[in-house]
A protein has these predicted regions:
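Short, acidic/polar
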Residues: 60-73, 215-228
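Hydrophobic faces of well-ordered beta-strands that scaffold small-molecule active sites
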Residues: 57-61, 76-80, 110-117, 227, ...
């Protein structure tokens, strides 16, 4: 329904002819007659958008099977969260295959963009000290409650210095969608790495997005490795601290990526779609 509405006002329908007092050529409109299970729409989009017949970029978030199916069909970019590269590579492979084989899309036109939190320092020791300072400001005992709820266990069985009580965690229901995926990620990642509950909580706070700690060079190495090994196409950057996190990202990490030829030095397009490399895609109305 949404895409039909966006395409109901093609660029050539707007004639803006002052001499004839005609702004829109009604004969060129594409009225919508949509009836779905939950929504219905008729007529033409009532707002003249700046896109002029080019639909905005569609972003989909989620990693459940239903999200992968939906996103690979409709989205231009997929937001996701992965702590471990193998799971990221599996997700990447799945959605690219779905796009190509199930929906006959060019998989290069579907971007996979996981979230990441860079914690930067001029030296590795400085970066780790910054991360430790951020961790010290958290009330981990209070955070145990939400983790216990996610895992379906009593908070009393969560000892910060120990691993998760895997024998007490009941299997989650795939029908729970995002909740199921979140629990599976937490449990599988913690078990694979053998980390403590404290470490799980420090990661859980980021919504499952990966934290990369180090110098600009070290973080750039990590990020380019993920892209080069088909774990993602790029990243949705988050800042670790409001007062200077953005400055570290822009002044330290971006120049390092630019020096490696991995980040633009000027914009290629005047649109968000174009700067994602998606010009000429389905966003251009036929």
């Amino acid at each position: 329904m949404v895409t039909q509405l966006w395409e109901s006002l093609p660029p050539d329908a707007i004639v803006a002819d002052a001499a004839s007092s005609t702004y829109v050529d009604a004969g060129r409109l594409r009225p919508v007659e949509f009836q779905g299970d939950y929504y219905r729409a008729t007529g033409v989009l009532g707002v003249v958008g700046g896109y002029r017949g080019r639909r905005p970029v569609l972003l989909q978030a989620g990693a459940s099977e239903s999200s992968k199916q939906f996103g690979s069909k409709w989205a231009d970019a997929l937001f996701t969260s992965h702590w471990m590269k193998p799971s990221a590579q599996e997700f990447y492979s799945d959605v690219k295959q779905y796009a190509a084989q199930k929906w006959q899309r060019d998989p290069e036109r579907l971007l996979v963009v996981p979230g990441v939190y860079p914690v930067l320092g001029a030296t590795e020791a400085e970066a780790r000290a910054r991360k430790a300072d951020l961790d010290d400001q958290l009330d981990l005992e209070d955070m145990k409650g939400s983790l216990a709820e996610l895992l379906g266990v009593d908070p009393a069985v969560l000892d910060l210095s120990r691993e998760l009580p895997y024998d007490k965690i009941a299997p989650s229901d795939p029908a729970d969608g995002a909740g199921h995926v979140r629990r599976e990620k937490v449990v599988d990642s913690a078990r694979e790495r053998g980390v403590s509950i404290k470490q799980v909580l420090l990661e859980y706070l980021t919504g499952g997005h990966r934290i990369v700690v180090g110098t600009p060079e070290q973080v750039a190495d990590d990020l380019t490795d993920w892209v080069d090994t088909d774990a993602c196409d790029g990243f949705n950057f988050n800042i670790d601290r409001y007062e200077d996190g953005l400055e570290h990202l822009v002044d330290w990490l971006v120049p390092e990526l630019q020096a490696r030829g991995r980040f633009r030095t000027e914009y290629e397009s005047t649109t968000f779609r174009g700067n994602l490399g998606l010009d000429g895609d389905a966003g251009d109305a036929a």
